[in-house]
Amino acid sequence: HFPGNSIFPGVLQIEALAQVGGVFVLSKVEDPENWGTLLLKIDNTKFKYKVSPGDQLILKMELLSAVRRGICLMYGTAYVGSKLVSESELTAQIVRNQPPNE
């Protein structure tokens, strides 16, 4: 990211949490293959420590509110080892996939 001071960008950490959140929320529906997720909001994001290229991120996600009307609130954390490096609240919506046009 910066010459001589490589870091793993925070925006990619949040993208990773959003991807995990999408898979996580779809695990809560009966037919996940028929649904997709949209990220609606990122809130209360904190980057606590530098993440360097080659560090292994461990991502954890918890549901803060049940899925209601297709919308849910999640809390995601990223760790390197046992050190919390970033955290964020994510609001997502599940949407039914459109059938392909034939």
Give the role of each language-model region.
Residues H1-T37, P100-E102:
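Hot-dog-fold acyl-thioester-processing enzymes
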Residues F2, S6, V11-L12, A16, ...:
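Solvent-exposed, flexible loop/coil residues
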Residues Q13, K28-W35, L39, T45, ...:
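Short, flexible coil/linker segments at or flanking structured domains
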Residues G21-K60, V85, A92:
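Hydrophobic beta-strand-centered segment that forms part of the acyl-chain substrate-binding groove
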Residues V51-E102:
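HotDog/MaoC-like acyl-thioester-processing domains
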